[in-house]
Amino acid sequence: MSQKIVFTNDIAATLDTIVDEAAPNRVFVITDVNVDYFVLSRLSDCKTVAGATRIVIKSGDINKNVDSLSQVWKQLCDGGASRKSLIINIGGGVVTDLGGFAAATFKRGVRFVNVPTTLLSAVDAAVGGKTGINFNGFKNEVGAFCEADAVIISTRFLD
């Protein structure tokens, strides 16, 4: 599988096109509390984000753990996610790592898209298929290599 990497400042239109082409039965946006508050308003013109079920996790690397992962899995279940659903991870490395791992493991694999909002996540965490969580005091102790269907990188978020 080849990962599609898109550089654009028209995130809304690009995301809408990618989701339309994927034709999922449901769309979920995973983000953290900071991105939910400060960044998602910049995507108010994105019909995909507006119509998606939002899953918000606590911010910070300390929350990239099995408890947050379990919360995401539960909300995916409660929201009716299936293997035909699509997860969009909008955030920094914590969100793209944890969201990607949730996608890789839920129902044995759900398609996902990463929209990194930090420079580090744009060049490292969101690209290359590294997903995972911290466990037992160790960083990225549990994880999988699972590439996102697409990574949308924009300097709009790197203010």
Residue ranges with predicted function:
Residues 1-86:
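ATP/NTP phosphate-donor binding region
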Residues 38, 94-101, 122:
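Short glycine/serine/threonine-rich phosphate/pyrophosphate-binding segments
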Residues 62, 93-95, 130-131, 145:
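Gly/Ser/Thr-rich beta-alpha loop segments that engage phosphate groups in nucleotides
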Residues 69-75, 92, 105, 120-124:
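Hydrophobic, well-ordered secondary-structure scaffolds
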Residues 87-89, 93, 112:
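Short glycine-aspartate micro-motif
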Residues 101-159:
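A glycine/threonine-rich phosphate-anchoring loop and its flanking beta-alpha core
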